[in-house]
Amino acid sequence: MFKKLFGKGKEVQKDIAIYTPLTGEFVKIEDIPDPVFAQKMMGEGFGINPTEGEVVSPIAGRVDNVFPTKHAIGLKADNGLELLVHIGLDTVQLDGEGFEVLVSSGDEVNVGDPLVRFNLEYINNNAKSVISPIIITNTDQAASINIYDENAVIKGETKVIDVTMN
């Protein structure tokens, strides 16, 4: 009550929508051709088989981590949700080749803000797969996760998950 009266503190929403960060074909997590992701060892989520080489922010929050090899970005929402956007499979071995990171750790982002551009053809030819996992890495802190089974998805526009944090 005092927070509302005196304007101190920020009301944090427990519910958050996760939008697809890539345009392409929705892939169920169980169908990602990598057991670390398919068996949910890193957390719950989904994959996208991209049709273009731009990643946008799937949530409003901040950039928590930009991997030195440019193939993945960690994001954190105000409500504590942590999200990993991993471009392709076994792309760490490319050592940043074919990727252009557009943000830095600590940057505030909104849904649809560009994060990374990548050369889709290069990754298709040099990595295990272009299928890109999007993973909630702190699934244990979520009260509920509802994943929508989509087909074709559009970056920054198609909502794919609703999460309620504890």
UniProtKB/Swiss-Prot annotation:
User: GO biological process: any one?
Assistant: phosphoenolpyruvate-dependent sugar phosphotransferase system
Name the principal localization, coarsely classed: cytoplasm
Originating species: Staphylococcus aureus (strain MSSA476)
Q: What is this protein called?
A: PTS system glucose-specific EIIA component
Assembly and interactions? Heterodimer with glycerol kinase (glpk).
Q: Sorted alphabetically, which InterPro entries does this protein's record hold?
A: Dup_hybrid_motif, PTS_EIIA_1_perm, PTS_EIIA_component
PTS EIIA type-1 domain: from which residue to which, for each copy?
34-138
Binding site residues for Zn(2+): 71, 86
Question: What role does this protein play?
Answer: The phosphoenolpyruvate-dependent sugar phosphotransferase system (sugar PTS), a major carbohydrate active transport system, catalyzes the phosphorylation of incoming sugar substrates concomitantly with their translocation across the cell membrane. The enzyme II complex composed of PtsG and Crr is involved in glucose transport.
